[in-house]
């Protein structure tokens, strides 16, 4: 497929989702064009057969067309331009369609709630990856070249320069999350950013670091700005809801002047009195749960084995707040490499299918087109083009991923926990330089590479033995 998404393909997709009048929204994540639809019954599921489309996921009110990284963004931009030129559906007809779809939407409320995380965090993922790669490369060079923290010279300065982006990102991350979360929940982004900043400020007048808020208690009550991302998400949701209620009663002439003012005062009061303590408890509970799962080999196997299923249902973005909580509590994201084993198991399954397929079969062609992205951590082409349509290989791929997760869990249990140096990043082989541990970057890279190898081999063996029987290998 060409670098640019062809207008013919996009027009065909637009026709098969019911035309421009059936489109409620248009956006994208890292690999998928996401089209919100008014009436899902008008969508033709055979979109997945179009050349250049790597898969399709249908929900009650959304069509997700898998293009792959980079292409999804270009597809969304081009589709938005097409929709801008298209005639708009009558408002009464849209309202009628929305009413017909209400019941179906209610049945998938949990999935839609988790999909909010994609809206909040997907715009941040390129920054996570870039900052994490720079930090990983700098750490690897410093380890190999024996550059100490207090070293002087051109090389240490260059390494510190490469590390500064990660420090900047994670220092002010809550403000970015607050902005995106407030928008995702239907509010004004800047209000969410301001409320999030309250979690970043310091409330200890004797502290020598941080940004002092100017007061150390809230009308005599102690302030405990814990919870970080968890608290910020709750506060941003509350901010958006309060803004909506205030706006309903605010005269139009005073809306710009008073709506945000009242919203901030009410939300900040709730944040200091309720949300900060609540967020802290939830943060500690979530960190405790996943830290214990990560240190339990069987728990790691279960997490890695089920992650492909989470990707299929589109709820894998719900793990991102957990990643951020682990970064705060451990200093690295120990869950991400475990879940990455799911993609490695799928690579092994695809290689087994390639080995068992006929020399000139369509299956071999499909595997050749999807295996390189799979090795580099982009799993959707393999999921929707190779393993999931044949089901048994999908199950054996999950088992291969579970074996890789079990390996990483065993190593952590024996005393070498490791993880990603960022809240989010690429998986597959690209993630190798992003691994870190208390023992250094090289042991962490070795553990991750070992896990990938175990998942590849296990996925290959499971699929060869159990995943090719009564399966279409043409």
From Swiss-Prot:
Sequence ranges on the Periplasmic membrane side: 145-157, 202-217, 282-301, 356-368, 415-440
Main EC class the enzyme belongs to: transferase
Pfam families, per the entry: PTS_EIIB, PTS_EIIC
UniProt topological domain (Cytoplasmic) ranges: 1-123, 179-180, 239-260, 323-334, 390-393, 462-474
Keyword flag Iron: no
Coiled-coil annotated residue ranges, if any: none
Signal peptide: none
Protein's job: The phosphoenolpyruvate-dependent sugar phosphotransferase system (sugar PTS), a major carbohydrate active transport system, catalyzes the phosphorylation of incoming sugar substrates concomitantly with their translocation across the cell membrane. This system is involved in N-acetylmuramic acid (MurNAc) transport, yielding cytoplasmic MurNAc-6-P. Is also able to take up anhydro-N-acetylmuramic acid (anhMurNAc), but cannot phosphorylate the carbon 6, probably because of the 1,6-anhydro ring.
The protein's name in its UniProt record: PTS system N-acetylmuramic acid-specific EIIBC component
Organism: Escherichia coli (strain UTI89 / UPEC)
Phylogenetic lineage: Bacteria, Pseudomonadati, Pseudomonadota, Gammaproteobacteria, Enterobacterales
């Amino acid at each position: 497929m060409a670098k640019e998404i062809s207008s013919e393909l996009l027009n065909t997709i637009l026709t098969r989702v019911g035309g421009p009048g059936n489109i409620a929204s248009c956006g994208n994540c890292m690999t998928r064009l996401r089209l919100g639809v008014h009436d899902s019954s008008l969508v033709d599921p055979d979109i997945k057969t179009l050349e250049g489309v790597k898969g399709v996921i249908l929900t009650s009110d959304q069509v997700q067309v898998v293009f792959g990284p980079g292409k999804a963004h270009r597809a969304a931009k081009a589709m938005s331009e097409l929709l801008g030129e298209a005639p708009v559906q009558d408002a009464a007809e849209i309202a009628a369609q929305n009413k017909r779809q209400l019941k179906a939407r209610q049945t998938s409320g949990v999935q839609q709630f988790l999909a909010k995380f994609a809206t909040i965090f997907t715009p941040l993922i390129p920054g996570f990856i870039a900052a994490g790669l720079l930090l990983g490369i700098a750490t690897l060079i410093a380890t190999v070249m024996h550059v100490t923290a207090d070293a002087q010279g051109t090389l240490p300065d260059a390494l510190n320069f490469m590390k500064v982006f990660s420090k900047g990102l994670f220092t002010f991350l809550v403000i970015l999350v607050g902005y995106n979360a407030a928008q995702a929940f239907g509010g004004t982004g800047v209000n969410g950013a301001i409320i999030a900043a309250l979690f970043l400020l310091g409330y200890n007048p004797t502290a020598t670091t941080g940004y002092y808020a100017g007061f150390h208690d809230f009308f005599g009550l102690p302030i405990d700005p814990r919870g970080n991302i968890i608290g910020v998400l709750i506060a941003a949701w509350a901010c958006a809801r309060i803004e909506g209620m205030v706006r309903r009663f605010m005269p139009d002439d005073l809306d710009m002047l008073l709506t945000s003012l009242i919203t901030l005062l009410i939300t900040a009061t709730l944040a200091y009195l309720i949300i900060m303590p609540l967020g802290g408890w939830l943060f500690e509970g979530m960190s405790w749960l996943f830290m214990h799962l990560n240190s339990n080999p069987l728990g790691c196997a279960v997490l890695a084995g089920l992650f492909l299923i989470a990707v299929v249902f589109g709820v894998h973005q719900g793990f991102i707040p957990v990643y951020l909580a682990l970064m705060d509590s451990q200093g690295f994201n120990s869950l991400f490499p475990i879940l990455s084993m799911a993609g490695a198991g799928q690579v092994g399954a695809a290689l087994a299918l390639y080995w068992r397929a006929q020399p000139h079969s369509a299956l071999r062609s499909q595997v050749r087109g999807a295996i390189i992205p799979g090795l580099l951590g982009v799993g959707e082409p393999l999921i929707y083009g190779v393993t999931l349509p044949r089901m048994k290989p999908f199950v054996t791929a999950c088992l291969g991923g579970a074996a890789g997760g079990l390996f990483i869990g065993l190593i952590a249990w024996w005393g070498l926990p490791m993880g990603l140096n960022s809240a989010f990043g690429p998986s597959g082989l690209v993630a190798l330089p992003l691994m870190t541990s208390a023992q250094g970057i090289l042991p962490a890279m070795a553990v991750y590479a070992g896990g990938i190898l175990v998942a590849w081999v296990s996925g290959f063996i499971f699929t060869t033995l159990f995943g090719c029987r009564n399966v279409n290998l043409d």
